[in-house]
């Protein structure tokens, strides 16, 4: 696809989004619930959306089969935080100085500029209750906190990543890669794991927590609680799972599903995506139980291409995360 055609497609997509928002503002139609699932480092061929079958993702495929799957879905950046900044503001991140990962400068000073309006701000103004469950990665100072950026509720982490579970748990299946600076923490319990952290802790609103559950499962549980609590009012749920972003960590339950995969790292990576898909299935089931499935818009997008070093597959495209080749910015996209 040449540059002019790509720009035209992006313009058409933005026109449709703003038309939809204008309908909400005009109250022409009843306000649908909106769930935006923003997964982390999911490659183009890491699910069954586009015919790849190495990792079974029946729930993601169900979303695609019952809706629309985009074969040419692009994000504006091949890395986490800039892509998130663009998604939540509807602007190219370069226009407000957020084109780099905030980790490249002193972490506490970096974040989504406070003069930028988010989709959560807009939907709050339209009468939506707004929730964020998952990864923020747009600043750790109080002025950048999700509760100050349009969200009524927050559960998750403020930074780029976290352990998924206590590595001393006998149920944990973990690969530590020294070349990536990953080493087992010197701890004896979950409370030690979480209490020794700062911004990469798990928070509920602004309270630091000790989370005993596998993190993907915990995000799913909190998301379903949010849906159930607000089933009688229009809600916007931003659900940025951390999976399958590293570190490579899973539980025995998901690990056992991939006994045929001989490479240990690939096996854990597949299990992490399985947990993600299972969580999406629980979200769908919850909507069906509350008779909300036909009143809810569900979007599933990856923040960038799969990490090749983490066994992400962007087939048939070249390379992946951190690059501007197709594999880095052409992502799974379903609605």
What are these regions (language model features)?
Residues 6:
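Cationic, low-complexity basic patches in intrinsically disordered or flexible, solvent-exposed regions
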Residues 19-29:
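Hydrophobic h-region of N-terminal signal peptides that target proteins for export
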Residues 28-335:
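Formylglycine-dependent sulfatase
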Residues 11-20:
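Sec-dependent signal peptide recognition
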